Amino acid sequence: MKIKIIFSYDGSAFLGSATQPHKKGVQDALSGALSHLGIFSPLLMASRTDKGVHASYAVASVECGDYFTNLEYLQKQLNKFSHPFIHIKKIEKVKDDFEVRFDVKSREYRYIFSHASYSPFMASYVHFYPKFDLGKANELLGFFVGKKDLKFFCKSGGDNKTTLREIFIARAYAYKDFSIFHFKANGFLRGQIRLSVASVLKVLEGKMSEKELKEQIEAKKQYNHFLAPPNGLYLSRICY
């Protein structure tokens, strides 16, 4: 029996979501929790995130045999071995031909800025940043929407066959003392969102022009090579 695991994780506790040489990845921790329950099949992840990036909604799949017919019980037991940095939100039975990565229709991320006074207790979970013009940020993010060749918004080391992506949503909104950038696309390149966020901030700071941002989005020239910090970024939705 193949199952789909929907879960969240605190990225500050891991070196990234993928398996790591010293077993410090989210995939390693969740595989270890499954092994305590006698499930040793390879765990497959729908998305990869870098060190320090969080997920409020991540998805994985694994073959678990026919022993665990009570999925609510499996969820409860798996949480015992996954806490405190991973929380299993739901487990569903899926078809044998379900592909957790390649069946994805869209992914969503949110980047969270806090405009409150700095707190070391929140430093791993938001990017502390002065207030900015949210309307202007929305305008700049709108440049990303559509089918784009985002080769200048990609870190090296990815396994992508193409740098073409379709961005469905790129917007900014406010919530209490936070400003949030929301991205939805059919897929993302490695480092794409953090490069996008940093580029928008550069324009807001007057260190880069709108024309330069547009040229980078149009794959004409790269003006910004820097990434926004990982701690403000959250994988927030995966749709099939």
Swiss-Prot record:
<feature type="active site" description="Nucleophile">
    <location>
        <position position="50"/>
    </location>
</feature>
<keyword id="KW-0819">tRNA processing</keyword>
<keyword id="KW-0413">Isomerase</keyword>
<protein>
    <recommendedName>
        <fullName>tRNA pseudouridine synthase A</fullName>
        <ecNumber>5.4.99.12</ecNumber>
    </recommendedName>
</protein>
<dbReference type="InterPro" id="IPR020103">
    <property type="entry name" value="PsdUridine_synth_cat_dom_sf"/>
</dbReference>
<dbReference type="Pfam" id="PF01416">
    <property type="entry name" value="PseudoU_synth_1"/>
</dbReference>
<dbReference type="InterPro" id="IPR001406">
    <property type="entry name" value="PsdUridine_synth_TruA"/>
</dbReference>
<comment type="similarity">
    <text>Belongs to the tRNA pseudouridine synthase TruA family.</text>
</comment>
<comment type="function">
    <text>Formation of pseudouridine at positions 38, 39 and 40 in the anticodon stem and loop of transfer RNAs.</text>
</comment>
<comment type="subunit">
    <text>Homodimer.</text>
</comment>
<dbReference type="InterPro" id="IPR020095">
    <property type="entry name" value="PsdUridine_synth_TruA_C"/>
</dbReference>
<dbReference type="InterPro" id="IPR020094">
    <property type="entry name" value="TruA/RsuA/RluB/E/F_N"/>
</dbReference>
<feature type="binding site">
    <location>
        <position position="109"/>
    </location>
    <ligand>
        <name>substrate</name>
    </ligand>
</feature>
<dbReference type="InterPro" id="IPR020097">
    <property type="entry name" value="PsdUridine_synth_TruA_a/b_dom"/>
</dbReference>
<dbReference type="GO" id="GO:0160147">
    <property type="term" value="F:tRNA pseudouridine(38-40) synthase activity"/>
</dbReference>
<dbReference type="GO" id="GO:0031119">
    <property type="term" value="P:tRNA pseudouridine synthesis"/>
</dbReference>
<dbReference type="GO" id="GO:0003723">
    <property type="term" value="F:RNA binding"/>
</dbReference>
